Design a protein with these regions (language model features):
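Active-site phosphate/pyrophosphate-binding segments
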Residues: 81-82, 98-177
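Glycine-rich phosphate-binding loops that contact phosphosugars or nucleotide phosphates
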Residues: 1-110
């Protein structure tokens, strides 16, 4: 049943140094990279493949990570907000996990879930459009700050790191640490 399916969030840079005592050749790993070139992820994929771990990636199949895992193990990420943008990554990861549960007999309504969520991107775009005026206010207020600190915990920790490191630090060269 679903009680014996263990799920762990592992950061590639940490795993490259410390490993994970529960990872074996029977493990399945899902990673994501919009750029397809994240060095820590590439290093981890190499080590995991040596262990016989099955690695799947949400990335461009023609990028470095896509080539490392094999195109047949890739799902293209969507940079286009109309196609889901960042939220599509969450959706795809959820679908991956739910399909695993489905194949184990723990989520028999997987196909119904997929059918019911197929038009979610239009709604997400409408929500973004409604928030745009408030986003503009926040941007004007904080855009020129010398230093910005982002704090997240629990379920928001990973999203906080993603936003601050990938979007602000790597793409906009903002000092965030």
């Amino acid at each position: 049943g679903d009680r014996d399916l263990e799920v762990y969030l592992i950061h590639a840079a940490e795993w490259n140094v410390m490993g994970h005592k529960r990872m074996t050749e029977r493990s399945v790993v899902l990673t994501a990279s919009e750029s397809g070139t994240t060095p820590e992820v590439l290093e981890a994929i190499g080590k995991m493949k040596e262990m016989g771990v099955r690695v799947y990636a949400m990335t461009n199949p023609e990028g470095k990570i896509g080539r490392a895992v094999g195109a047949e193990n890739c799902v293209m990420m969507a940079s286009d907000h109309g196609a889901g943008g960042c939220e599509k990554g969450y959706y795809l990861a959820d679908c991956f996990g739910l399909r695993l549960l489905n194949r184990r007999g723990c989520f028999p309504k997987f196909d119904l879930f997929i059918e019911q969520t197929k038009d979610i991107w239009k709604d997400m775009l409408d929500i973004r459009k409604r928030f745009e005026p408030r986003a503009g206010e926040l941007a004007r207020k904080y855009a020129l700050a010398d230093y910005t600190m982002f704090i997240g915990s629990g379920a928001l920790w990973g999203e906080t790191v993603l936003y601050s490191m990938c979007l602000l630090e790597e793409m906009q060269w903002k000092r965030i640490r």
